[in-house]
Every structure is written in structure tokens, then in C-alpha cells.
Amino acid sequence: MRLSDITVLSVTFNNNLLTGLMLKSLAKQLGELPECLIIDNGTTLPADERLKDLVTLFDNRNQHVTGNYRQCSKNHCSTIDYALKRLIKTKWCLLVDNDVLFKPTLKKFLADLNDDEFDVCGEIGWDDAPPERLFPYFCLINVDKFKNENLNYFDNDRCIGPGSKEIGACGPNTKRWYKDTGCSFLEDIKDRWQIKLIKMSDVIIHKKSNGYGFTDEKTFLTVNKELYS
């Protein structure tokens, strides 16, 4: 797969440090910074304007472009949908969370991919609550196919409301979990797209998935400093 065919997409939310170091890690592991689209979904802290010198920065603060669904995951998901349909011009989108760091294996992984053999590439599972989803932490999506088939990445009518009691990887789903990013998309493509399954841990370290939670940012960045410095 050629880097020139890929746009890296990430949504930043009130955290310039993680977004900046994610991009720094990407450039270090690839030896260059490919086309990147960073969407600012912040509510209190604007994205660092200096990012405009390196990437395309799209201002969606307070969801003034995509609309506010009053739930963070819904806003995140609708923003990705907007970007896939209207902003990304390359054949492929590499969707990543802004709190990931890339491993040295990334460059060979992308170079070895034959993009004629799949339509989407990622890991399927469920972490916070059912149902299964294509994790948005690292996922390659064929944007041309997505547009040609008039698909959606976000469907507000298929979001889980409060009261679901299924048992998930994190225990009983007693909180107000909603169907998170990548669920309805997987439902729509699982029987018609070629899905290449991978282990994300082969190419990234994700702050949340690797046990650092939402708060232990300093430990995450210190332990994995060699991936971006």
C-alpha cells in the first residue's frame, strides 16, 4: 500500500499534547508525515494552531459543523462520518485515536499490505460494552467504496440507550453506554466487504486499551517515550 493513497484521520478533544505526540510518533515510524486530517472537536481547549503547518486542521469545535448529539461518542462518530463523506479525497483512510503511539513495525505493515485484497482492515471486538465493533483506534477504510455504496459511519437510530444489562469485557453494562464508534458500520459491511483482521497491538500502543485509562497520561507518555522522541 502506498502512503500517497492514505489520509490519516484523527479527532482531537481538548488535548493538544496527545494529538501532537501521536503525529510525532507517526512521522518517526514512517520516516515522513503522510497526509493527515485532524478534526478539532474540542469544547474547552482549541487545537494548537501550529498543527496547520503540518496537517489539515478542520475546526468543528462545539460540533458547530456536524451538530451536537449531547454524547461524546455520538459526536465523535458523526464527525468521522462527515470526514469520510466530505473531507477525505484519497482512496484510503487510516482512522486512529489521538491517544495512540505507533510501533516501529508500522512502516513494514503498511508497505506489505495489498489493497486489492481487502476493503477494510482492523480489529473486531468490544471493550466497554456490547455489541462488537471495528475498533476506531487503528482502522483502514476504503473511502471510495464507502462513498460509492452510500454507507454511513454513524446511525443515531441504532444507538443503544440506557438500561442494557449485557455482560461485557468490563463487567455488567449498567452505565449509560451507547453503541460506540464502529458498531453500525460493521453491521452494514460484515456480509459484503472483504475484512482483513489484525491485532492492533502489533502496530500501536493505545492509552486506554493498554491499561492507562483516561487519566494516567504522564505514565503512558513516559513509558513509551521511545516511540515518539
Predicted regions and their residues:
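N-proximal low-complexity "stem/linker" segments adjacent to membrane-targeting elements
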Residues: 1-24
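Short, charged/polar "capping" segments at the starts of alpha-helices
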Residues: 17-19, 43-49
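Short, acidic, metal-binding catalytic loop of nucleotide-sugar glycosyltransferases
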Residues: 24-33
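Short beta-strand/loop segment that forms part of the nucleotide-sugar
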Residues: 34-43, 59-60
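Active-site-proximal specificity loops/subdomain of glycosyltransferases
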Residues: 48-89
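Conserved catalytic core of nucleotide-sugar-dependent glycosyltransferases
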Residues: 73, 102-183
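Short beta-strand-to-loop acidic/aromatic patch adjacent to the donor-nucleotide binding site
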Residues: 90-101
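C-terminal catalytic/acceptor-binding lobe
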Residues: 162-229
